[in-house]
Amino acid sequence: MGIKKYNPTTNGRRNMTTNDFAEITTDRPEKSLLAPLSKKAGRNNQGKITVRHQGGGHKRQYRIIDFKRNKDGIPGRVATIEYDPNRSANIALINYVDGEKRYILAPKTLEVGMEVMSGPESDIKIGNALPLINIPVGTVVHNIELKPGRGGQLVRSAGTSAQVLGKEGKYVLVRLTSGEVRLVLSACRASIGQVGNEQHELIKIGKAGRSRWLGKRPTVRGSVMNPVDHPHGGGEGRSPIGRKSPMSPWGKPTLGFKTRKKNKASDKFIVRRRKK
C-alpha cells in the first residue's frame, strides 16, 4: 500500500493522509460472506455505557473471516484483495477447488491468482496455514491460535507479525509484535507471513469529522468535568486534580498503575514480558 497526501485546500485536508488502496482489486464484497452488524454505541444490554467514545459512524456489514483455516488439503486460489471496514488489515477472497469461498486475512505480498493451502502437509509459503509444530524456527507468522481449533486470536492487525523462536516439548516459543515471548501449544495453527497493509499506522486522520465517520466520539479531559462526572472535576478555573495520582473516571489509579491481575492463569506461558 501507499500513503496518499492532499494539497492543503482546507484546514482539514492540510494534515490528512489516506490509503491509496492500490492493492484493492474490487469494491464489491462476496454477498454470501456478509452478515448484518448493528450499532452498539458502547452500550451493554442495560443501555449503560461500558466502552466510552463509541457511537455514530458509517453503516457497516460484517465480513465473515476464516480465522480457523481448517480446510485441510484442499487448494484455494486468491480471487480478490478487499477492504474491510471492520479491521485495519485487508482481506482476501479464496475460491477453493470444491466450490467453497472464504475470506482470510491478506498477508503482505499475497496477490490475486496465488494458491493457498491449509493443513500439516502444506508448504511454508505466504498465506498457507499449518500447526506450529510443522513451522520451521525463524519463520514469520500471523493469526496464531491460543487453543487448537478455536481460531486465530493473536497477531491479526495490519502490519503485525510474530516469529517462531524454538520448540520445547508440546509447546512452541513465539515472539509477538510487542516483544513478548510466549509459549503456545504446538498443535495451534498459524498462518505464514506478515499481515499486509503495513503502512496503516502512518495514516493521519486530519480532522475531527473523519474520526466521527469511523464511529469514534470525542475524548474529554476529566479536569474540565464536574466532580459528579470525574475525580479530576470541579474547582474554580484551572484547578489541580487534588489527588496523589491521576485517577480514572471510576476512581482507580491510572497512568502507570499496573492493572494486570496477579497470578493470572496465562502467566506461566509468558517467558518474557513485553517491552514497556
Curated annotation (Swiss-Prot):
The protein's name in its UniProt record: Large ribosomal subunit protein uL2
UniProt entry tagged with the keyword rRNA-binding: yes
Source organism superkingdom: Bacteria
Stored NCBIfam families: rplB_bact
Alphabetic keyword roster: Ribonucleoprotein, Ribosomal protein, RNA-binding, rRNA-binding
Keyword RNA-binding: yes
Compositional bias annotation for Polar residues: 7-20
Quaternary structure note: Part of the 50S ribosomal subunit. Forms a bridge to the 30S subunit in the 70S ribosome.
Region of interest (Disordered), residue spans: 1-20, 219-276
One term under GO cellular component: large ribosomal subunit
BP-aspect Gene Ontology terms: cytoplasmic translation
Chain's role: One of the primary rRNA binding proteins. Required for association of the 30S and 50S subunits to form the 70S ribosome, for tRNA binding and peptide bond formation. It has been suggested to have peptidyltransferase activity; this is somewhat controversial. Makes several contacts with the 16S rRNA in the 70S ribosome.
Pfam families: Ribosomal_L2, Ribosomal_L2_C
Family from the record: Belongs to the universal ribosomal protein uL2 family.
GO molecular function, one term: rRNA binding
